[in-house]
Amino acid sequence: MDGFFWKTWLVVAALAIGGTSSLPHKPLTYEEAVDLAVSTYNGKSGEESLYRLLEAVPPPKWDPLSESNQELNLTIKETVCLVAEERSLEECDFQDDGAVMGCTGYFFFGESPPVLVLTCEPLGEDEEQNQEEEEEEEKEEDEKDQPRRVKRFKKFFRKLKKSVKKRVKKFFKKPRVIGVTIPF
């Protein structure tokens, strides 16, 4: 009888252990993944202002139980709140002229612990460039009555200014890449 008790106990224990999840991480919904990406950007980017979700593009298939890599795309915008204030994002309004960042995140659940790599780039630079080109065209029309030599010098310096501006913007507007492990 005593042997029967231990055999039964062993079977129950084996079934209990076998019934637990074999996932190395807890299930992560798409909304939780987006929130995690935004909070990671706010904590690791080195920016002074907090950023809040502007738009998230849900993937066709987000599997919260997946052990493979998952991708997410989102757009965040600068808020009036500072990182040092440690306020809730719901309390923070967007800045009127705040920076808008397009972000792509990759969750690597096959790693132990899981890893998030987030790449964010500023958006909206093309609109500024188009506006500058329109202003230059208007200036050229106004300068048609000037001597040829003056026109050439102005054109040369405009090209030089545009080239320097483009290089400076490119230098300072590099994408931010943030990689973190996710403690579960």
UniProtKB/Swiss-Prot annotation:
The keyword Disulfide bond applies. Its main location: secreted. Expressed by the venom gland. The lineage of its organism: Eukaryota, Metazoa, Chordata, Craniata, Vertebrata. Residues 125-147 are annotated as: Disordered. Residues 23-150 form a propeptide. Belongs to the cathelicidin family. It comes from Pseudonaja textilis. The putative mature sequence has been predicted by AMPA, a predictive algorithm for identification of peptide stretches with antimicrobial properties. Disulfide bonds join C81-C92, C103-C120. Gene3D superfamilies: 3.10.450.10. This is Cathelicidin-related peptide Pt_CRAMP2. Pfam families: Cathelicidins. Residues 125-144 have a biased composition (Acidic residues). It is found in: Secreted; Target cell membrane. It comes from the Eukaryota. The keyword Membrane applies. GO terms for biological process: defense response to bacterium. GO terms for cellular component: extracellular space; membrane; other organism cell membrane. Potent antimicrobial peptide against most of Gram-negative bacteria, some Gram-positive bacteria (Bacillus) and some fungi (C.albicans, P.pastoris, A.terreus, A.nidulans, and C.globosum). Adopts an amphipathic alpha helical conformation, that may allow to partition into the target membrane. No hemolytic and cytotoxic activities have been observed on mammalian cells. Keywords: Antibiotic, Antimicrobial, Cleavage on pair of basic residues, Disulfide bond, Membrane, Secreted, Signal, Target cell membrane, Target membrane. InterPro entries: Cathelicidin-like, Cystatin_sf.
